[in-house]
A protein has these predicted regions:
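Positively charged n-region of N-terminal signal peptides that target proteins for export
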Residues: 1-5, 10-12
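C-terminal motif of bacterial Sec signal peptides marking the signal peptidase cleavage site
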Residues: 16-20
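Exported/periplasmic ABC-transporter solute-binding proteins
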Residues: 22-67, 86, 106, 114, ...
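Signal peptide-proximal N-terminal region
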Residues: 68-79
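Short, high-confidence coil segments that cap the C-terminus of an alpha-helix
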Residues: 75, 97-98, 219
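Ligand-binding clamshell of periplasmic/extracellular solute-binding protein-like
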Residues: 80-90, 97-113
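A short, gly/pro- and small-residue-rich
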Residues: 115-123
């Protein structure tokens, strides 16, 4: 089984230490899958490390939550691997060590469960999100929302295997902009471009990269999550908040992953951290980062 050090295969490593970094967005969005470590201390006390795979759109809020958790549990080191849910699922299926999977869509969690990789009775829905169409503030774009997004000179769009890309494609199908498909995730970026009259589309492999493309001005518009606009209120205009009637609910499920390498301390730490994520205290934090915690 591949060991914990995903840094060897993932570009763009960010190390978060309780003493040195804040849990807020930096000036530019993260544009790579990242490993984030929380819970480092200066004491000689041995720490128990848990591996938590999180959708890229959860990076900021989960860093904050880890900081809060470590105030009472300094003996636990939480190592995050943040990327698209599809990429994370593939890594788990390939044998990367993981204790908790927090996905941005039900499909990836369904696949995890079907593969027998989930700890039974640990799955829970945590938050809901919403797809938004964004542009740089005062960009002067002619685009007003998804229905006329083809007016843009360039679009940042996540691939179909990325939840936000799939939700965007589903909305476009429901608007009649794309033909119906058994699996909207299979609609290629080239097909989307063709349906929009040949507009230039920059395909991104996670939602953070979509945000980066818009914030840095390399694309005129993009589709991301409402929660991703946290910290960018002065930089971005939300052109449209896409209705759930078009996308369906954007539910984020969480579950523990079977980890045969974990010892008793690691298993207990993973169980306790999952309980914390589902707590009322954590719900208040999610709410503050623009997530909707009114889910079943």
């Amino acid at each position: 089984m591949k060991k914990r050090l995903l840094a060897a295969v993932l570009a763009g490593i960010m190390v978060f230490s309780m003493a040195g970094c804040s849990g807020t967005n930096s000036d530019s969005a993260s544009d790579n899958g990242t490993d984030t470590q929380a819970g480092d201390t200066d004491s000689d006390e041995e720490q128990t490390e848990i591996q938590v795979f999180i959708a890229a759109s959860l990076n900021t809020v989960m860093t904050d939550l880890a900081e809060r958790y470590n105030e009472d549990h300094p003996d636990v080191k939480i190592t995050y691997n943040a990327d698209s849910s599809g990429t994370l699922l593939t890594q788990i299926q390939e044998g990367y060590e993981c204790d908790i999977f927090f996905s941005a869509a039900q499909k990836q969690m369904d696949d995890l469960e079907a593969d027998g990789l989930m700890v039974e009775s640990t799955r829970a829905n945590v938050v809901n999100n919403q797809v938004v169409v964004v542009t740089l503030k005062d960009s002067g774009t002619a685009v007003t929302g998804l229905e006329d997004i083809g007016k843009a000179e360039s679009i940042a769009l996540a691939g179909g295997s990325v939840p936000v890309g799939r939700y965007t494609r589903q909305a476009m199908v429901n608007l009649g902009m794309l033909p119906k498909a058994d699996d909207v995730a299979a609609i290629t970026t080239e097909e989307v471009s063709e349906a929009l009259g040949g507009v230039e589309i920059s395909e991104q492999d996670n939602v953070s990269k979509v945000l980066t493309a818009v914030v840095e001005g390399s694309c005129e518009v993009g589709t991301t999550y409402y929660s991703d606009t946290y910290g960018y209120e002065d930089d971005l205009d939300i052109l449209q908040t896409v209705s759930y009637d078009l996308t369906g609910n954007v539910i984020y499920p969480i579950a523990r992953v079977i980890n045969e390498e974990a010892d008793d301390a690691q298993t207990a730490a993973a169980e306790d951290f999952l309980k914390f994520i589902l707590s009322d205290e954590a719900k208040e934090v999610f709410d503050s980062y623009y997530f909707d915690t009114n889910v079943e």
